[in-house]
C-alpha cells in the first residue's frame, strides 16, 4: 500500500527504535513482524496486516513484560494498516 513519506519515515524510525530495544529483541515473533514492517517501509509501502498478526504479537509482548509497552510499539500500532471488516466472499 502506497503512503506518504512522512508516515513511512515515522514507521522506519519506530521500527529501528523497537529493534534496538533489548526486551523486544527477546520476542522472536515480534522481531520477525517488525523486520517485515521495516522492509515494507524501505520500499515506500505501509505494511498491511491482512492476517492480523501484529496487534496480537504486541499484546503478548505487553503481557509478558508486566503490561509495559514501549512508546514506539504504541505508535506503530496506529501506523500499521489492518482490515476494518470482513470482506465476505469474492
Swiss-Prot record:
Protein's UniProt keywords contain Heme: no
Keyword Repeat: no
Alphabetically ordered keywords of this record: Bacteriocin immunity, Plasmid
Signal sequence range: none
GO biological process: bacteriocin immunity
Function: Imparts immunity to sakacin-A to naturally sensitive host strains.
Protein name: Sakacin-A immunity factor
Source organism of this protein record: Latilactobacillus sakei (Lactobacillus sakei)
